[in-house]
């Protein structure tokens, strides 16, 4: 009887162990549920709330299963939605040898570049082409006004386009007095789409477009993993904020 009971326990364990879902399978279920929810909602605020909850739940799942190698695929899916604090916690938890593997190495390198271009660091000079084909460098602007705001965006990016009225208001308020310059850095592949968006949104500041090849690759140089991304640089060439909101920008400019 004891042998039979032991055999049943072993069989039960085998079924339980083999039926346990991997971290990525659990994440896929979570993702599918969120997609289904989004299809039933029209309100933008409600959609944003669903996505925020998804990121929170996905990140929690990721941390709980960080030793599961299938979680590497979750990192690739969710990395671009994480906060700087979450990224720091995540990469500290992942075994160092996995960060050097082909799956995670690219996003880990992006994260390291983000760290180098976070608040408190000296800015990295970038150069790319304007609409007329001439080159413009960030170093030509830094020091000419109190602050330079670099805005990484694209014509196809809804949140980027919705940010433009805010930036226009800041520009109109602070540019005439020499407080603020803005440099738009487009991540568009399509030059015509970029130029059309600049014209449609009536953006009065300077613009360049990432050419996706050195030396005209500013998005790579600043580790841009999601847009819009803004970087605020002071007269001394020090980054004072990365992705500040409108209130934070105004607080800095009004000091």
Feature locations, PLM:
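Hydrophobic beta-strand anchors of alpha/beta hydrolase catalytic cores
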Residues: 149-150, 182
């Amino acid at each position: 009887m004891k042998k039979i009971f032991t055999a049943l326990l072993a069989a039960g364990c085998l079924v339980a162990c083999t039926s346990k879902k991997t971290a990525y399978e659990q994440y896929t279920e979570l993702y599918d549920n969120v997609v289904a929810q989004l299809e039933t909602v029209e309100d933008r605020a409600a959609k944003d709330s669903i996505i925020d909850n998804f990121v929170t739940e996905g990140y929690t799942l990721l941390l709980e299963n960080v030793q599961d190698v299938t979680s590497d695929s979750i990192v690739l899916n969710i990395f671009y939605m994480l906060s700087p604090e979450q990224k720091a916690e995540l990469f500290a938890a992942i075994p160092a040898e996995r960060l050097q593997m082909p799956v995670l190495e690219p996003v880990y390198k992006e994260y390291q570049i983000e760290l180098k271009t976070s608040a408190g660091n000296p800015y990295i000079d970038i150069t790319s082409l304007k609409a007329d084909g001439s080159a413009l460098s960030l170093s030509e602007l830094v020091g000419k006004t109190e602050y330079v705001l670099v805005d990484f965006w694209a014509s196809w990016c809804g949140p980027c386009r919705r940010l433009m009225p805010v930036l226009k208001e800041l520009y109109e308020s602070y540019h005439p007095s020499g407080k603020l310059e803005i440099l738009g850095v487009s991540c568009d592949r399509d030059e015509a789409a970029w130029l059309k968006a600049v014209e449609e949104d009536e953006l009065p500041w300077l613009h360049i477009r990432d050419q996706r090849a050195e030396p005209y690759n500013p998005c790579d140089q600043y580790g841009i993993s999601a847009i819009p991304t803004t970087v605020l640089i002071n007269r001394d060439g020090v980054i004072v904020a990365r992705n500040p909101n409108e209130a934070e920008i105004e607080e800095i400019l009004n000091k």
